[in-house]
Regions:
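N-terminal, positively charged/glycine-rich alpha-helical extensions of SAM-dependent methyltransferases
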Residues: 1-12
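A short acidic, Gly/Pro-enriched loop at the edge of an enzyme's catalytic core
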Residues: 100-112
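A short SAM/SAH-binding and catalytic strip from SAM-dependent methyltransferases
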Residues: 110-123
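A short glycine-rich, Lys/Arg-flanked "PGG" loop and its adjoining helix->strand segment in the class I
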Residues: 125-140
Length: 161
């Protein structure tokens, strides 16, 4: 169902100018990759990767080695099939696991990102603790999440970004 409605990228992206929805999604993902300063050969973790649309796009864009993790085995199988079909299985792979208990060694990633995923964690502090554990010292975690507040004031410029 998600793939039919959203394509391979199950996330929001604001539209700019005459961008298509697909172009907006790519810009959103490329911005995230650029903020992480990803480069060829870096090992990167996508927490809550779905079927791996952003993982494949970021791997193509940066030539980094992207590992996606999702709790859903169907998504792993579908995503890995798409990695192979799109010719990026040497750069991107998906694994089944829980971001509350990441199945990776300490300090094993040059960067970690999550796109609208960690908001679903039952214990965000534990989830972010796991992310910190698998990040190499000095590496960055980047995250896009929905945030809601009753105190939103749209006239405040910094809240429109």
């Amino acid at each position: 169902f998600y793939e039919w409605g959203w394509g391979a990228c199950f996330h929001f992206a604001d539209r700019r100018g005459r961008e298509t929805f697909a172009q907006s999604l790519l810009r959103h993902e490329y911005y995230l990759a650029s903020r992480l300063a990803l480069k060829a050969g870096d090992c990167v973790l996508d927490c809550g990767c779905g079927i791996g649309g952003p993982a494949r796009n970021i791997a193509r864009f940066t030539r980094a080695q992207v590992t996606g993790i999702t709790i859903n085995q169907f998504q792993v199988d579908r995503g890995n099939a798409l990695c192979k079909q799109e010719g990026v299985s040497h750069l991107a792979k998906l694994v089944q696991g829980d971001f509350m208990n990441l199945p990776f060694k300490d300090s094993s990633f040059d960067g970690v990102y999550a796109i609208e995923a960690t908001c679903h964690a039952p214990d965000r502090a534990k989830c972010y603790g796991e992310i910190l554990r698998v990040l190499k010292p000095g590496a960055t975690f980047a995250c896009y999440e929905w945030c809601l507040t009753d105190a939103y004031d749209g006239s405040e410029r910094h809240k429109k970004r």
